[in-house]
Amino acid sequence: MEAVLNELVSVEDLKNFERKFQSEQAAGSVSKSTQFEYAWCLVRSKYNEDIRRGIVLLEELLPKGSKEEQRDYVFYLAVGNYRLKEYEKALKYVRGLLQTEPQNNQAKELERLIDKAMKKDGLVGMAIVGGMALGVAGLAGLIGLAVSKSKS
């Protein structure tokens, strides 16, 4: 599963699917499969703007898809949001998938990895806040010491 989350699309694949998407768009009608393939490539890009664009394309597809297609759309919506570190959104999508498919092992594993990332980021965030609080307390102590020395 971590390979799916960390896999980067090749520039060549991205350009090929982008050309196909733009060609169909210019002709006036983009097929669901072309839009999904392009979105799937964008979600695997190393650039956040590409990932966001892929998410938008997947969200557009969601109401149009069959049950099987929707499962794929929701899964890659979770992957895209995970890659953007939008863990709450990723969790929302993966849990929605697990409501309809409680035995989906891929979704269970993705949920576990999202929870793990949230805990890691939460601990890192708490450490940063804690370090800042210690820094402020230390600075206040130094100021207090300087003031008391200047009075004596």
From Swiss-Prot:
Record's keyword terms, sorted: Acetylation, Apoptosis, Membrane, Mitochondrion, Mitochondrion outer membrane, Peroxisome, Phosphoprotein, TPR repeat, Transmembrane, Transmembrane helix, Ubl conjugation
Post-translational modification: Ubiquitinated by MARCHF5.
SUPFAM superfamilies per UniProt: TPR-like (SSF48452)
GO cellular component, one term: peroxisome
Domain of life: Eukaryota
Modified residues (N-acetylmethionine): 1
Any one GO MF annotation of this record: identical protein binding
InterPro entries: Fis1, Fis1_cytosol, Fis1_TPR_C, Fis1_TPR_N, TPR-like_helical_dom_sf
One family name in Pfam for this protein: Fis1_TPR_C
GO terms under biological process: apoptotic process; mitochondrial fission; mitochondrion organization; negative regulation of ATP metabolic process; negative regulation of fatty acid transport; peroxisome fission; positive regulation of intrinsic apoptotic signaling pathway; protein targeting to mitochondrion
Gene3D superfamilies documented for this protein: Tetratricopeptide repeat domain (1.25.40.10)
CDD domains named among the record's database cross-references: Fis1
Residue intervals on the Cytoplasmic side: 1-122
Chain positions found as Phosphoserine: 10
Membrane topology field: Single-pass membrane protein
TM segment ranges: 123-143
Principal location: mitochondrion
Residue ranges annotated as Mitochondrial intermembrane topological domain: 144-152
Protein localization: Mitochondrion outer membrane; Peroxisome membrane
Role according to the record: Involved in the fragmentation of the mitochondrial network and its perinuclear clustering. Plays a minor role in the recruitment and association of the fission mediator dynamin-related protein 1 (DNM1L) to the mitochondrial surface and mitochondrial fission. May not be essential for the assembly of functional fission complexes and the subsequent membrane scission event. Also mediates peroxisomal fission. May act when the products of fission are directed toward mitochondrial homeostasis, mitophagy, or apoptosis.
Subunit structure: Interacts with DNM1L/DLP1 through the TPR region; may form part of a larger protein complex at the endoplasmic reticulum-mitochondrial interface during mitochondrial fission. Interacts with MARCHF5. Interacts with MIEF1. Interacts with PEX11A, PEX11B and PEX11G.
Record family assignment: Belongs to the FIS1 family.
Comment on protein domains: The C-terminus is required for mitochondrial or peroxisomal localization, while the N-terminus is necessary for mitochondrial or peroxisomal fission, localization and regulation of the interaction with DNM1L.
Name used for this protein in its record: Mitochondrial fission 1 protein
Species whose genome carries this gene: Mus musculus (Mouse)
